[in-house]
Amino acid sequence: ERTFRRKKDAEELSCGFEVIEKLTEKFKAKAQKPVNFIISLQTKTAYADNDYLGEVLSNLIDNAIKYSKESVEISISSEESERYTILKVRDNGLGISEADQKVIFQKYERAATAKRSRKNGASGFGLGLNFVDQVIKAHEGRIFVNSTEGEFTEFTIYLPLETPNNRHNR
């Protein structure tokens, strides 16, 4: 079992959310259907590895588009609590069943929605959300999913403002 590690030392981590703008442009350009992004950022940075956070968001956006209805709406928001930067990615897609929500971050797991979408050209091995989970854990954060089948899926990421490795810098 390989453990995921961040590429950079904790002191070097500060991710500006410009990465979100780049990703939304990229996905709008390559999507096979209309995609509308609603961006609402109360906080502009996260204590995270820029490259890896970009990969996490890319993964979540890609899934939102893959497993969506004809017209895709994705909202990305950020806020800060006392201890965390909270990042949310929500879509108006096909949703994920309660049973699948319990296992969705496990390696090689694919939601029933994903299996059904294979007929529509969605591909992959079920590694994406496991990777997302590993990255967030490597940043001492947490990720949760909330979804209603046929309506929406929302991923909420909590990234600590302070970790044991960066306390002395604040």
Task: Tell where the protein language model's regions lie, with residue ranges.
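Short helix-loop "hinge" at the ATP-lid/N-box region of the Bergerat-fold HATPase_c
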Residues: A64-I65
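Glycine-rich ATP-lid/hinge loop adjacent to the conserved G-boxes
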Residues: E109-A122
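Conserved glycine-rich
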Residues: E140-G141
